[in-house]
A protein has these predicted regions:
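Bacterial N-terminal signal peptides that target proteins for export
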Residues: 2-12
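Bacterial N-terminal signal peptides
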Residues: 11-21
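Short, low-complexity N-terminal intrinsically disordered segments enriched in polar/charged residues
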Residues: 22-67, 176-181, 185-188
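Short beta-strand edge/turn micro-motifs at domain boundaries
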Residues: 25, 120, 136-175
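N-terminal, post-signal-peptide region of Sec/Tat-exported proteins
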Residues: 56-90
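A mature extracytoplasmic/lumenal domain signature
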Residues: 65-67, 75, 123-127, 141-142, ...
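Surface-exposed, charged secondary-structure patches
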Residues: 70, 83-134, 183-187
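A short local loop/turn or secondary-structure capping micro-motif enriched for an aromatic residue
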Residues: 80-81, 129-131, 165-170
Length: 188
C-alpha cells in the first residue's frame, strides 16, 4: 500500500511540475522569426519560386525545387470532404512552367527556422489568378541546402511543400487571415 501512495505522490509532483512549466512558457511570446543570412536566403528561395510561378518559367522553378520534392495540397472538395493531391517537384515544375494565366502568390507573417542544412518556412498565403483571389491557405515549406552556395539563395532548395487551400473567395480569406495584405490590383 505504501508503495502506491508514494507513487501517487511522485506522480502528483511530476504533474504539477509539468503544468507549472507549461503555464510559464505559455506566457512567453514566441521568438521572432530568424533574421540571419541563411533565413534571408530561405526567404529568397521561396520568393524565387513565386517569381517562377508568376512568369511560368520552368528554369527558374527547377533552380529552386528538387526534382523529387513532394508537393502536397490539402483542401475541401465540392462536398466539403478534405482531400489531398500529391505531386513530385519535377511534375510541378513542368506543369506550372507552361504558358498560362497570370499567377501571383504572396505570403505574410512568415516564420523561418534554420537548423544546419534544413530549414522550414511557414506562412499564410493568398494566390491570385488573373487579378482574382483564387484561394488562400497556409504554406509549410521544407528546404535543404543542396545547391550552389553562390546562388542568390545560398544553395537552399525546396524538398517539400504542404499547403492548404481555401477557395471560398477573397472575403472569406480576409476573414480567415486578418493580416492578409490589400489586393495587389487596383479596384475597377
Amino acid at each position: 500500500m505504501r508503495f502506491f501512495a508514494r507513487m501517487k505522490r511522485i506522480s502528483l509532483i511530476a504533474l504539477i511540475a509539468v503544468l507549472v512549466s507549461c503555464s510559464t512558457n505559455a506566457d512567453r511570446p514566441a521568438p521572432p522569426a530568424a533574421v540571419t543570412p541563411d533565413a534571408d536566403a530561405v526567404r529568397a528561395a521561396v520568393q524565387h519560386t513565386f517569381d517562377g510561378l508568376a512568369t511560368h518559367d520552368s528554369t527558374m522553378l527547377a533552380a529552386v525545387i528538387l526534382p523529387d520534392a513532394n508537393f502536397q495540397r490539402w483542401g475541401a472538395d465540392s462536398t466539403g470532404t478534405w482531400r489531398t493531391v500529391n505531386l513530385r517537384g519535377g511534375a510541378f515544375t513542368s506543369r506550372l512552367g507552361q504558358p498560362g494565366p497570370a499567377y501571383l502568390e504572396r505570403t505574410w507573417e512568415a516564420d523561418v527556422r534554420v537548423d544546419g542544412d534544413v530549414a522550414v518556412f511557414s506562412a499564410p498565403y493568398d494566390f491570385w489568378v488573373e487579378q482574382t483571389c483564387s484561394h488562400c491557405g497556409y504554406d509549410a515549406i521544407t528546404l535543404v541546402r543542396s545547391g550552389a552556395v553562390e546562388s542568390d539563395f545560398r544553395g537552399w532548395r525546396i524538398a517539400s511543400l504542404t499547403y492548404t487551400v481555401d477557395a471560398s473567395g477573397e472575403d472569406a480569406c480576409r476573414e480567415r487571415f486578418a493580416g492578409m495584405p490589400a489586393s495587389p490590383f487596383p479596384a475597377e
